[in-house]
UniProtKB/Swiss-Prot annotation:
Name used for this protein in its record: Porphobilinogen deaminase
Native source species: Rickettsia bellii (strain OSU 85-389)
A GO MF term: hydroxymethylbilane synthase activity
Cofactor note: Binds 1 dipyrromethane group covalently.
Residues carrying S-(dipyrrolylmethanemethyl)cysteine: 242
Gene: hemC
One protein family per Pfam: Porphobil_deamC
Enzyme class, spelled out: transferase
HAMAP family: Porphobil_deam
Family: Belongs to the HMBS family.
């Protein structure tokens, strides 16, 4: 077994926090392995003044890290699974995930506790077309503006009254110890299905790296790995990008089956389709493909 691992990650506070969670898992199983964090600046980090869908999508948060992986400058990469496209380079694999955190979104507002309570024509900041479509469904009167940046910068924009509210993932807020119940309010899945893979930390490796495969076997949280299959199958089948309003959430039923709620909107946001599938873990991927076909038909 190797004695050191180079781990590629973005430089953000959240990315480094998540990388350290992965290192904790590695150390539990392989206490003698030295883990070196390799911080990589991605295109998505550099370009902050444009919506992701105008500059290449969430893959911009992975491109340089995946290139470092392919060039053997790092041994494994840590990502937020919600940033990972449905189709990744053929020589790479999402080989492990950590246990999923609560996947709900959070309404962040200094003056009101829910989207419904906002005054008429209030301004919400988000760069997510999924969140935008869900908000418009609830409150078509609200103004929605493009809003990017890390957690601290977004909250500062709230304080400076640039917007009335924003929406963030609970998982990121919790990992940064930034969830404050005074102005952070959970949004239920019935109102806003999460991004595919939201709340999951993913480990990506080269398919031919047998040492990393063995390490991933030990740290992989299998129940979460099975849950994300139908969600990721939808994403892969549609080859969806940041212009596509898409969401999904999987959970286990008492009998061990997986229930997945899916959402898909058309590109201009004028229509939205929902679909639910119940599947056996062995066939859960097929349920994502079926959901894609059903929702595409309803939107046509």
């Amino acid at each position: 077994m190797i004695n050191s691992i180079r781990i590629g990650t973005r430089k953000s506070k959240l990315a480094l926090t998540q990388t350290n969670l992965v290192i904790e898992q590695i150390k539990q199983h392989f206490p003698n392995i030295n883990c070196e964090i390799v911080e990589i600046t991605t295109s998505g980090d550099l370009i902050q003044n444009k919506p992701l869908y105008d500059i290449g999508g969430k893959a911009l948060f992975l491109k340089e890290i995946e290139q470092a992986l392919l060039n053997k400058k790092v041994d494994l990469a840590v990502h937020s699974l919600k940033d990972v496209p449905g189709i990744i380079p053929k020589d790479l694999s999402i080989e492990a995930v950590l246990e999923r955190e609560d996947s709900r979104d959070v309404f962040v507002c200094l003056t009101h506790k829910s989207i419904e309570e906002l005054p008429k024509n209030a301004v919400i900041g988000t760069s997510s077309v999924r969140r935008k479509l869900c908000v418009q469904r609830m409150r078509p009167d609200l103004e929605i503006i493009v809003f990017r940046g890390n957690v601290d910068s977004r909250i500062n924009k709230l304080i400076n009254k640039e917007v009335d509210a924003t929406i963030l993932a609970y998982a990121g807020l919790k990992r940064l110890n930034a969830f404050n119940p005074e102005y952070c309010h959970l949004i239920e899945h019935s109102q806003m299905l999460p991004c595919i893979g939201q709340g999951v930390i993913a480990i990506e490796i080269r398919k031919d790296d047998h040492d990393m495969i063995e390490i991933c076997k030990q740290i992989n949280h299998l129940p979460t790995f099975e849950l994300i299959k139908p969600e990721r199958a939808l994403l892969e089948y549609l080859d969806a990008n940041c212009r596509t309003p898409i969401g999904a959430y999987s959970k286990y039923l008492d009998n061990g089956d997986i229930q997945t709620d899916f959402m898909l909107g058309n590109l201009d946001g004028s229509k939205i389709a929902f679909h639910t599938e119940i599947s056996n873990p062995k066939t859960s991927k097929e349920s994502g493909i079926k959901a894609a076909k059903v929702m595409l038909l309803s939107l046509s």
